[in-house]
């Protein structure tokens, strides 16, 4: 599979960036595919749309197997992280990968780029190890080399939401990390 195409140019509605976060957070139709298309002006492949639709359901568990460079991190995981922190105040997104380099060098820079595109950076703080949004939601990342780091994350905030992303799961050889993720709630 090849990488999803992204239209060149400014995001839709970019002239009115300041109100985007609250408009999105209030929107009852704010699903991940709609978010990617409306706010990031992305054209996604059907398989990416299907994955994002599956992630719309609370308590969903989605496993994705796709080719290298197909957009798993940049077009699926990053969209899910950004959508989640905007849509669910005070919520938490936990991101891990077999090596932290995947989170640090692939996911966070993509998030930073999307945040700039979406808001010009307003309302977000993107650091080397995480993302904070003005509504209190946050995303954190760590290496899956130690299963104990996956322990103890819980749903939080008004929305009672937790999103856990295991990127490049094929590089995680210890099943304990997956058992730890299953116990998080």
Annotate the PLM regions.
Residues 2-5, 10-185:
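Phosphate/NTP-binding elements of NTP-utilizing enzymes
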